A protein has these predicted regions:
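Solvent-exposed, low-complexity segments and loops of surface/extracellular structural proteins
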Residues: 1-200
Length: 200
């Protein structure tokens, strides 16, 4: 059994899997800087099947440091969630949220304290208000599909409006008296002439 093992981008995916197979549980540290999806998948699964978690069980708590880049390219939802769960808050964790599902966005929300920045995020009414707020808090130029959003969801959007792309509120925005003056101002400031804005 290997102990005090540290993995880095110099090891390829096959080497990472082989080393993790003989490492002790919870004993391995990872510097994720420069790692590509195949290496990160090996960190999660070792030589096991995809989503097996055979590798991530060997990683120490907060054991992933360095620059960790997460996206759907080459990684499953289970793999992304597992990697985020073992990332140190001191790591630089960046997420490309392009085309992420509701479940994947929920995972980002659950691990938001470990994430430094999120790009290409799109949130909709399928996300809860708390999820919308946390995801947008780390986002850059996010897109919001505001159609049918509740007052609480729109409050979460308004509170993070600076992280929403200009004109990024989708096609339909409905405002009611449940929104404060400041929230209405923030939302209208990001709406464009392409938005169908209803005030009821």
């Amino acid at each position: 059994t290997l102990t005090n093992l540290t993995l880095a981008s110099g090891e390829d995916a096959t080497e990472i899997a082989a080393l993790l197979n003989v490492a002790g549980a919870g004993s391995v540290s990872v510097d994720a800087t420069g790692m590509v999806a195949a290496q990160l998948a090996a960190i999660h699964d070792a030589a096991g099947a995809a989503d097996s978690g055979a590798g991530i069980a060997k990683i120490a708590t907060n054991g992933i440091t360095g620059d960790l880049a997460i996206s759907r390219t080459g990684l499953t939802e289970i793999e992304m969630n597992g990697l985020l769960g073992k990332a140190s808050t001191a790591a630089n964790v960046t997420v490309d949220a392009n085309n992420m599902s509701t479940t994947e966005l929920q995972d980002l929300h659950d691990n938001i304290a470990r994430i430094d920045s999120i790009t290409n995020a799109t949130v909709t009414t399928t996300e809860e208000a708390a999820e919308i707020g946390s995801i947008l808090s780390k986002a850059t130029d996010a897109t919001v599909t505001a159609t049918s959003m509740t007052a609480a969801e729109l409050t979460a959007v308004a509170g993070n409006i600076g992280n929403v792309a200009a004109g990024g509120l989708g096609t339909t925005l409905t405002l009611t008296s449940a929104q404060s003056v400041d929230e209405i101002s923030a939302l209208m400031g990001t709406a464009t002439t392409d938005n169908n804005v209803a005030v009821v």
